[in-house]
Amino acid sequence: MSQLTDSFGRSFAYLRLSLTEACNFRCSYCLPDGYQADGRPRFLQVEEIGRLVRAFAALGMSKIRLTGGEPSLRRDLDEIIATVATVPGIRKVAITTNGTLLPRRLPGWHRAGLTALNVSMDSLQRERFKTITGHDRLPEIQQGLALAQALGLPTIKLNAVLLRGLNDDELPQWMDYLRDRPFSVRFIELMRTGDNEAYFQRHHLRADVVIEQLLAAGWHERPRAADAGPAREFGHPDHRGSIGIIAPYSRDFCKGCNRLRVTAKGDLRLCLFGEFGVPLRPLLQRDEDHDALLARITTQLGLKAAGHGLHQGQTGLTPHLASIGG
């Protein structure tokens, strides 16, 4: 059981760890001009990641999600996964990726200990996918998903950002896609960040619109588990797959928060849209600093706010989602 509990009684057993800020896509809602390196980046190394994960595991965390940027750009990703997977107490190692390198690299990740896969796939239509992401790579991603099924990965999820006027008419196609595929598709409300205000105003779509369509089509909301994340899950008796709705602008979205974040440069972020980061990297250089690292993490939890400030237009330190991995 997690020892990480904040002043609002929320318990944290899930860490989202960014491995890089770099990305090979140019998604219109995130990095439309592509990744621009700020000097020579120095992201967390394998040894530092090992010390970090051991600390969180000692505090009761059991799930680690590797994010980016695009984590598959790390050449040492197999080693990172193996390092994380062998930490005592870690039961689930997941990755969120754009999926372009799955056909080539997924078998190695699986052997290293990967147990769950999330793939960003904002459209089922090839031309639309190219328009949104800046790359015509949907066939490779579909190939990678088939490989994930063949390897027997127990959890496969797809993430699609809801974009008004770009992909908001695809729900019937997604329903058909899930009829024979045991995937969970997550529709995510577009979130305002530091550099996308105009884009947000043009393309934000409330998730309620999708929920109404799901209910009208005979889908039913499933009971939420006590340790579930923010998604509202919907199922249908005639479909193998499920649909999740992640609506950060909905009431009580932050009430069940169960995750913390660490950036690719080693800063603890208590909230995706928090106003500050807590540097952990100085305590990741020696095994002897383990106890000091535990103390820094637990002390900072007392500063976690009840909720984000998105409704007030507050986006915190997040210039775009590639900087912290969502």
Predicted regions and their residues:
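Glycine-centered loop/turn positions within well-structured domains
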Residues: 25, 126-127, 252, 278
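Residues that scaffold the ATP/ADP-binding catalytic core of kinase and kinase-like folds
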Residues: 26, 30, 74, 127, ...
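Conserved G/P- and acidic residue-centered "switch" motifs that form tight phosphate/ATP-binding loops
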Residues: 70
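Radical SAM/AdoMet-radical enzyme domain recognition
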Residues: 43-65, 73-188
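Auxiliary Fe-S-binding modules of radical SAM enzymes
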Residues: 1-14, 176-180, 190-326
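A short acidic, helix-capping loop that chelates divalent metal ions and anchors anionic groups
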Residues: 35-39, 103, 125-132, 194-198, ...
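Canonical Radical SAM [4Fe-4S] cluster-binding loop centered on the CxxxCxxC motif
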Residues: 7-47, 272
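Residue-level signature of catalytic and energy-coupling elements of molecular machines
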Residues: 19, 66, 185, 266
